[in-house]
Amino acid sequence: MEIKNHFGVYGVCLQEGKLLCIERTRGPYQHRFDLPGGSQELGEGLTETLKREVLEETGYTLSRYSNPRMYDVLVQEEGQDFAVHHIMAFYDIVLDFEGSQKSLPHEVLDGSNDSANAVWVPIEQMTQEHASPLVLKVKAELQGFPELDMTSYKNWKVKHAKSTSS
């Protein structure tokens, strides 16, 4: 089986028991809650990627970031003969609510980006049915049982429609 590597940088923002998430519109995590963040651009530092991606996906700048850590998952989509080794850098982030929220880029608003709007989701609602493996890593961390080893998701089901259950 072929394994493809993917590296991304993501923000973890928790307020009053709710996690800042974005709704993925494409890819293996579509129609699930995911963390704001994504791939580095050529020559971009980790925190530069973090700031750019959070701004692009939420419209907010960061007032601070801390606690960098790394996790990884192996995701094999149902019916595919390859898997993606998703390596992720997480930072705890605090959004700058003092400044005005920037308008989301045209690509987010017109649906050509891989994410839609930002939402605050209660941690207890995070299940494999509703959340990406990244969010599940954060949930385990918040429950005091961080998954330090690579987590494998074989036969990952890509959702082709948004779930209507809560």
Give the residues covered by each predicted segment.
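Nudix hydrolase/Nudix homology domain
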Residues: 31, 109-166
